[in-house]
Amino acid sequence: MNGTPRVLFLDNFDSFSYNLVDEFQRLGAVVEVWRNDTPLNVLSERLDRHDLLVASPGPGRPEDAGVLVPLLQATFGRCPVFGVCLGHQALAVACGGEVSPASQLVHGKAADVNHDDAGVFAGFDRPFVAGRYHSLAVTTVPDTFRVTAWIEMDGGRRLPMAMEDVERRLLGVQFHPESVLSRDGSVLIERVLAWAV
C-alpha cells in the first residue's frame, strides 16, 4: 500500500461495528466513522477524500438502514466499497438484487465457506471457516456481480457468502471477518485494504 489508507466507515448501529473499525485501524488505516442517520449530502461530500467505503453489519433490512442504500448508489464509480453482512445485502439491493429471509437463522455459528481461490480469497483454505450472524441472505445476485464465496446448501444450492463487481470495485461478504469465529478474518481485511488502494 502506498501512503496511509483512508476509510469512510458507515456504522449501521451494530455491536460489531467497532470490532471492524479496530481491525482497519490496527492495519494502519485512518478510519472516519459516521452513522447511517447522517444526511446523505454530508457523507457524499466526504467520499472523495477516502480510499474505501465500509458498510458495516447492522439489524434489519437494507432498505430500512437510513442512508445506507442511497449512499452506496452515490458511491459507485467514486470509491471502492466493502460491505459486511447488512452492507453486503445492501450492495445487492442497491444494484437490483434481492434479499430474503435465510432458510436458517444463524447467529454466532462457524461455517465452512467455499470460494473461487481468486482476488481477496486467493490461497485461502478451501473451505475456510467464517463466523455467520444473519437472518437475511442475498437470494438474487445482481447481474454485474459474480459470487466469489458460498456455502453448499441442501439440494446443491449455493448460498452466496461473498460477491464482487470488478468493474465498479464493489465487494460484499455475508460473514463477519472481524469475528473470532473467522480464522483468517484479519488476513481478509488486510487484503481488502490492499484491493481498495
Task: Mark where each language-model region is.
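Extreme N-terminal starter segment of soluble prokaryotic enzymes
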Residues: 2-8
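Cysteine-nucleophile active-site neighborhood
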Residues: 6, 50-122, 129, 189
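Active-site-adjacent helical/loop segments in soluble small-molecule enzymes
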Residues: 17
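A short, Lys/Arg-enriched amphipathic alpha-helix followed by its capping loop at the start of a domain
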Residues: 23-29
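A short beta-strand-loop structural module common to alpha/beta enzyme folds
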Residues: 30-38
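Short amphipathic alpha-helix with an adjacent loop that forms part of the alpha/beta core around
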Residues: 40-49
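Catalytic beta-strand/loop cores that center a nucleophilic Ser/Cys/Thr
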Residues: 119-167
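Acyltransferase
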Residues: 180-197
